[in-house]
Amino acid sequence: MSETKTEKATFGAGCFWQVEEAYRDTPGVIETAVGYEGGHVENPSYEQVCSGNTGHAEVTQVTFDPEQVSYEELVEKFWAVHDPTQLNRQGPDVGDQYRTVIFTHSDEQAEIARRSLENARQRFRDPIVTTVEPATGFWKAEEYHQCYLQKRQEQGGLLGMLMGR
């Protein structure tokens, strides 16, 4: 029996809880993890990243089977799950850790992401501020952040969380 060949995709699109939830049940996605990428501090804590002094973005790293879901499809979902025209914010979350960014793991991914960015520019009225950058090091966030919204479903999901349940 042959082992499944997997690839990684890393997306910053605001709060990593919502981004992870958007990808978690996608067919072909094997695993998701939330963490930090793009900064200058090794293994930063959530508090450090939120201070705005580390340069990291909150990201979701997706491990996927390219025979079941293509990188192109994952990038298309990226455009659908957030507003790529908002600079350093998504909704009420403000700060450069919430920036819109695609971190690529290969030259092929970089080419696909850039081409997708050009196509997306034709679909949005306002200028897109998303950057495409090479992945330089993913730091997994604290365990309580992993599958955060899924863990809260027993307590009424996101609505329950917002209502203090």
What are these regions (language model features)?
Residues M1-R165:
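Flexible coil/turn and secondary-structure edge motifs
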